[in-house]
């Protein structure tokens, strides 16, 4: 109780442990701020993952673009990728570029197709990141159908800059192989020979082509044969890929391909999972598929170790992925709070237990000290008694020995006297009869 006029005493200083506990208990506001920052960062990471999954989709899917006469055809691929033309068509159309169908076009059932379309698009757009091509009949050669509306249709892929390339000479076997849980995806292929390209087949003296003779139908052939398979074998010859060059020219097949994880490719093209590796025959190209050379990966459970599979799953199930992510974050925060509360409570209990143990230790130490003092006193008393006894013995033993010696000496003297008297008496008795005898 404070008396009036007396100042209030200053508060007692808090120990370092109490201050540490207060620091441990106070941070809920900081945890909330940390939680908000984590949510923002994770939302940015989720959007980045979504962008990356879209990037992968652009690299795997076939893209189609078209433009009518007088317009520009625009082809573009994302960063670190280039255009790989799959096919090109330039001809007339009644629906895409013309609102009304002329009578002349109705009566003409022939389709006006320019045979140089694919080569022209390849020259302008192949291996470019972006391509802008003016659609005009003069670009693709003579106009076979003057006065009719025509359009340019191009199918292409965006091939990454880092691809697997393989070149096989004529009359040799092409073998493509991917590791487990990955599928083949063919980006480009050409069969023939370029004029300026060195001889990679080492055939010795041979006839050089006067112009580039390449057959790009090899892309369609290999796509049918190897797309979505784990292994692929095909014989490189004119029977399968045609003969684009003059007789005597040594040709070769160049392929650019990639091995794509199973989950990603099936997410982009679900038809890949339904491919049947049974024996097939392609009537168009006369190709017989051999299931021993081309096969689909077994549908057993395979553990995908590639992190890209996670991006494919996030792309296919964005809501579920976001829900799982937020749930994991909330569970982690709850576990952190529980651990913090347990730590604070356990620290308090441990401190009280330590204090009680210290009191017990101090009491036991005092009891041990008292018992040790009592034992020391008893030991000192016990040690004093033998000392006194020994002292008594040391003082009494000489006196006792002298008295006994005197008695013993007295007894010896008495004994000697008795013996002497006996001998004297015995001597007198023996001498009397002898004297008496002489007398008588």
Swiss-Prot record:
Biased composition (Acidic residues): 367-381
GO molecular function, one term: heparin binding
InterPro entries tied to this protein: EVA1_dom (IPR039500), Lectin_gal-bd_dom (IPR000922), Lectin_gal-bd_sf (IPR043159)
Record region (Disordered): 1-23, 364-384
Localization: Cell membrane
Annotated Pfam families: FAM176 (PF14851), SUEL_Lectin (PF02140)
CDD domains per record: Gal_Rha_Lectin_EVA1_EVA1C_rpt1, Gal_Rha_Lectin_EVA1_EVA1C_rpt2
Glycosylation sites (chain numbering): 62, 109, 165
Residue ranges, Cytoplasmic side: 343-440
Residues that span the membrane, as ranges: 322-342
Heme found in the keyword field: no
Membrane topology value: Single-pass membrane protein
Cell membrane keyword on record: yes
UniProt signal peptide: 1-48
Tissue: Ubiquitous.
Stretches in topological domain Extracellular: 49-321
Keywords: Cell membrane, Glycoprotein, Lectin, Membrane, Repeat, Signal, Transmembrane, Transmembrane helix
Record-annotated SUEL-type lectin domain positions: 67-159, 168-260
GO cellular component: extracellular region; plasma membrane
Coiled coil: none
Biased composition range(s): Pro residues: 1-13
PROSITE patterns registered for this protein in UniProt: SUEL_LECTIN
PANTHER family registered for this protein in UniProt: PROTEIN EVA-1
Protein role: Binds heparin.
Protein's name in the database: Protein eva-1 homolog C
């Amino acid at each position: 109780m404070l008396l009036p006029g007396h100042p209030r005493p200053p508060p007692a200083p808090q120990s370092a442990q109490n201050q540490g506990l207060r620091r441990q208990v106070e941070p809920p506001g900081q945890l909330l701020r940390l939680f908000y920052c984590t949510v923002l960062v994770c939302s940015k990471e989720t959007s980045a993952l979504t962008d990356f999954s879209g990037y992968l989709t652009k690299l795997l899917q076939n893209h189609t673009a078209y433009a009518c006469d007088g317009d520009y055809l625009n082809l573009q691929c994302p960063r670190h990728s280039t255009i790989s033309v799959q096919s090109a068509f330039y001809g007339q159309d009644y629906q895409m570029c013309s609102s009304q169908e002329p009578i002349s076009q109705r009566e003409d059932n022939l389709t006006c197709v320019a045979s140089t379309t694919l080569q022209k698009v390849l020259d302008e757009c192949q291996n470019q990141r972006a391509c802008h091509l003016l659609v005009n009949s003069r670009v693709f050669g003579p106009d076979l159908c003057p006065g009719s509306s025509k359009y340019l249709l191009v199918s292409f892929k965006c091939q990454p800059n880092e691809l697997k390339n393989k070149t096989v000479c004529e009359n040799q076997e092409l073998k493509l192989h991917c590791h487990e849980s990955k599928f083949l995806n063919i980006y480009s292929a050409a069969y023939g020979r370029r004029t300026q390209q060195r001889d990679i087949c080492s055939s010795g003296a041979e006839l050089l082509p006067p112009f580039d003779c390449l057959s790009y139908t090899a892309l369609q052939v290999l796509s049918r044969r190897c797309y979505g398979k784990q292994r692929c074998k095909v014989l490189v010859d004119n029977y399968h890929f045609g003969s684009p060059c003059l007789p005597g020219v040594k040709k070769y097949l160049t392929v650019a391909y990639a091995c794509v994880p199973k989950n990603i490719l099936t997410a982009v093209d679900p038809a890949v999972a339904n491919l049947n590796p049974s024996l097939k025959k392609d009537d168009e190209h006369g190709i017989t598929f051999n299931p021993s050379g081309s096969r689909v990966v077994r549908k057993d459970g395979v553990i995908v170790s590639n992190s890209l599979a996670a991006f494919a799953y996030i792309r296919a199930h964005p809501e579920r992925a976001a829900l799982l992510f937020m749930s994991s974050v909330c569970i982690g925060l709850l576990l952190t709070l529980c651990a913090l509360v347990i730590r604070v409570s356990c620290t308090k209990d441990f401190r009280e237990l330590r204090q009680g143990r210290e009191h017990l230790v101090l009491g036991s130490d005092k009891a041990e000290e008292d018992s040790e003092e009592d034992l020391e006193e008893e030991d000192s008393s016990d040690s004093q008694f033998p000392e006194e006894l020994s002292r008594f013995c040391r003082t009494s033993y000489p006196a006792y020995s002298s008295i006994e010696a005197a008695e013993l000496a007295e007894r010896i003297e008495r004994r000697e006297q008795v013996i002497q008297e006996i001998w004297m008496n015995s001597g007198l008795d023996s001498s009397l009869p002898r004297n008496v005898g002489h007398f008588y």
